């Protein structure tokens, strides 16, 4: 997908870029039966308290029901449209199954309108087909990877991402997969994945250009703690510019901000990680 550049008519437009969807999407309107109303909580919980900062004020949008399970086995489907999805970085494509049902899936790189895809153990190794990891050969690039059999895809769903199958255990229970982050981990061989990479890989190259675009996306400004008042942040207060005044930087809630590990030490999935992403760099 091509990157569109703008003439510097204003300071905000000067470095702005966007994706040229005109020549890459089919231009169809979304299927109404697969749309749901998406409420914007603006980072508040049921008590109205802020639980996630810097959220709120985005444009209204509908949620597209995306099929992450791909459990409609051995029924061929045809790609009808490739559409924009405002809720994710990847595009989505509409599948029309032979029995009349329609479902959205994440659009893989290189998929075309009119292409046939299928799910199931006997599916061919073709971009867009979904099958268990045990049936996919080593070296294949995959996306939409399940963590638990039948639980739906959790890994490699963003634009341009993929993972690679490195090998399989001797007993055939686990498959070794290398993720985009560099982490190498074992995943149950009964879990499903989709062949190929996620499309729209140039999404990360887009320069929003101005703060107003982020406001449309629901991203509010991030204010430094050192310019707040003492009642709002441990770094706040003082006459003019002041240092932190503590042994180490703190979060707004008074906990140490830097150098503290945030992953649970007794997490059950630790034994499945063969190489941490931080060790891979």
Curated annotation (Swiss-Prot):
Bias (Basic residues) ranges: 261-281
Region entry Disordered, spans: 223-281
Matching PROSITE patterns: RIBOSOMAL_L2 (PS00467)
Domain of life: Bacteria
Biological processes per GO annotation: cytoplasmic translation
Keyword S-adenosyl-L-methionine: no
Gene Ontology CC terms, in alphabetical order: large ribosomal subunit
Keyword annotations from UniProtKB, A to Z: Ribonucleoprotein, Ribosomal protein, RNA-binding, rRNA-binding
Alphabetized GO MF terms: rRNA binding; structural constituent of ribosome; transferase activity
A Pfam family assignment: Ribosomal_L2_C
Keyword rRNA-binding among UniProt keywords: yes
Homology family: Belongs to the universal ribosomal protein uL2 family.
Function: One of the primary rRNA binding proteins. Required for association of the 30S and 50S subunits to form the 70S ribosome, for tRNA binding and peptide bond formation. It has been suggested to have peptidyltransferase activity; this is somewhat controversial. Makes several contacts with the 16S rRNA in the 70S ribosome.
Subunit details: Part of the 50S ribosomal subunit. Forms a bridge to the 30S subunit in the 70S ribosome.
Protein name, as recorded: Large ribosomal subunit protein uL2
Name of the gene encoding the protein in the UniProt record: rplB
